[in-house]
């Protein structure tokens, strides 16, 4: 995962009018590689932390064991197939809010994911997101 949005205090506090908001899940939205998701804090609600699910090129993030678990849990065949193709984190489905999908620029996400980190999994050098484009996918 590539996580961001720590807020001005560096503690993940909310920037949305001082309020947290509940987790929203959908059977139509899954944690495929590139999914843009809101992190859940200790209260079980979302604040300002978000993350992108990543699966590095050549990395098998969805093992046969995970496929078997998804099948046993009743995942639809097309969802299992999409995970096998794209990679991702099916264990996060139905636990937090998926609200977008990176469809251009995963190479940048992969580069960030390979950055050196400290013992707390924080990058040893700060990484700043300077801009983001949010648009409706036309493909």
Residue ranges and their predicted role:
Residues 1-139:
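Cyclophilin-like peptidyl-prolyl cis-trans isomerases
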């Amino acid at each position: 995962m590539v996580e961001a949005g720590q807020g001005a205090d560096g503690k993940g506090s909310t920037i949305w009018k001082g309020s947290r908001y509940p987790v929203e899940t959908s059977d139509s939205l899954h944690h495929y590689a590139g999914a843009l998701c809101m992190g859940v804090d200790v209260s079980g609600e979302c604040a300002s932390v978000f993350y992108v699910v990543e699966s590095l090129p050549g990395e098998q993030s969805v093992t046969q064991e995970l496929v078997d678990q998804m099948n046993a849990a009743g995942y639809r065949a097309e969802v299992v197939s999409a995970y096998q193709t794209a990679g991702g984190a099916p264990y996060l489905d139905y636990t937090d809010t998926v609200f977008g999908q990176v469809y251009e620029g995963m190479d940048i996400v992969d580069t960030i994911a390979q950055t050196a980190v400290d013992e707390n999994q924080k990058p040893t050098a700060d990484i700043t997101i300077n801009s983001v484009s949010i648009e409706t996918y036309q493909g």
